[in-house]
């Protein structure tokens, strides 16, 4: 597959004699603080708030927890909250070999909308009880996948519907519910294979559940950063007609219907812009749900429960959902992360591209490489090793060879995986045979060499992205503060051994550079 070469510069140059290009860093969105309340309702408040904090990260799953919370509240108000939560009515969640529970979260339409069973929201949430982290990875609905021999290749959002329809065609005796259960299983299996991680559960909510939840909390406030004009929004009656939807810039109050339209619209923007708006809406729901007026009101809590109704589907048992409540206290706001796959090779998660299409063909996305290997490594990194990015380590990438473009190609490569490369350029020496990795900030701070390289981010990078060279135990003269200024914690001085490694793994370096050894030029 073909890629393309781009460049991006953030700010000015350091006083070093050799130009170094600074880079724009990715942003992590975290959840807010938990409110406090006294007495019995403090216990209820803490329980529900914890799970609405989760809703900003794993919204669909939170709906199930709210459902369980209301059942606990209505069935056993006279019992101690702690006694209920830690009772035998909870079952531990399934986990992988790393102790993570991975849940596929889905958002679909409803019977009144075209494509009612298209999964337009696909998210994998990974819960690590031991470290108290929740990491979420969004998969674009337009990702092109092979469904089966009959349907061939299609967008992943159609997999559930096509599988269920095929099941009902092949087995006329089964019910529609059984057919869609099979569809959920196949979709879960497909996402698991794409990401190369086990997925233990799925959970799905539809448009009705979404709008009713917003209405149940009396609307939400959203700060609209850019005016949205969509003359092609689907009509409310589910017909082939359109309606015009417009939202102006500024703080807006949305009811359920308007919030849904704001989150769904994409005809005049893009799928990725829509994903950003969806995050805005989910955050607004969470903020409103955290307000005392909602969480301390049994009536409003009951409205939330009633809004869920049949609009929520999951293979999580009620006992497992109660177990989620049991472990909720382990998850703090600064241990919750959200990522997404996209088609911008200069951004974190930018492993996809839009192939040319014939007139009338649907928009689709494919991986830059002919397999899911880099997407799988990314999923492993962000879902199973969130501590890597939590370390906050910064890097400077330097080309120590005569091969042009090594630093810039490595820059793009590392940015796609979310590493914070603050500068890149040429090394003082352009004839470096063996890559050198300098833990600059640690050594300058007086740390021992062992302590300076004891870093989760650096360890993962050396194992998976820069698997050549060696680490330096002291700061060379050319990189001393007198001779060289760097904003980075780690300096990566790339040598000829790294160029040779690039040649063997050239498919990951988008730009079609021809890598050959210097000796063979």
Label each region the model flagged.
Residues 2-521:
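Non-catalytic, solvent-exposed segments at the cell envelope interface
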